[in-house]
């Protein structure tokens, strides 16, 4: 079909074909019309049609600006092999080597990707239930907590060969790393071994040896955060809906703070400079605690089912990923926060990793129905 291109102003007659479209070009409205089948609209009808076009233009303009101003923009989708099923746990990144480590729990392996191309470059097998990964660049070693075996597995970062393992209790899960001492803190034990208490184990990652076990009442521990300027560790005690504070020099529990503004506290972000702890709960809130007093300051609404939360000090942003979306808040001051946006991911897409050095945010979305598991790569705006 041949089309004539016509741009018209105000009350002038406008040729309109039986099929027409409006396009945005240099802020003008363009009408595409069929020469052979055209009629003319003038006067009031033209004004009404013009108003419709203006309205459509504004809608599209606002939508476009909204995408550009969103805190995250999807730039890549990495599709995983169809046999990768079940939930994911935590990511790790090797910045120098350009690698992204992912932990599909039921796949009994850690997947290694080239984070620049999205290519799957290695599958590290022989892991019953991978939970968390630490990569030490100086030693080129990969440390993986295995919940089934109840140990910390240590792999060579070049050959991916298993070097050794450190025996823990079953359900070895979340970790916290002290870069100064090279000690890794691992929560393990609890309900999976039919105990009403859990262990926070201390492992020397250089020697590959366990140094101590710190007993904590409660059968389920989750994410933790370590202070750099003091020996404190803050740990989510999900069993008791509280935050436990451990002195890592004395290796003992020194305080417990109740979390009353939300339920099922699992994820955690930390703003050490402003003494704010962001305790993310699966009930759909973040409770903000003052680490100088242990008191709750405020609560922020987030998507339910959260599994990962992080605070970025440079941008003063909080990222919390729940069941199907990421909520991003900006910290205007230590007690006040503004929601920047809620970005959709996918069903049960609730584990993620912010990598400020790459300006990227990675989200794992499990396999669902006929759709394979995916890793979504967002650019941070």
Please report, for each region that a protein language model flagged, where it lies by residue.
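Short, Lys/Arg-enriched N-terminal segments with co-localized hydrophobic residues
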Residues: 27-45
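Bacterial N-terminal signal peptides
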Residues: 51-61
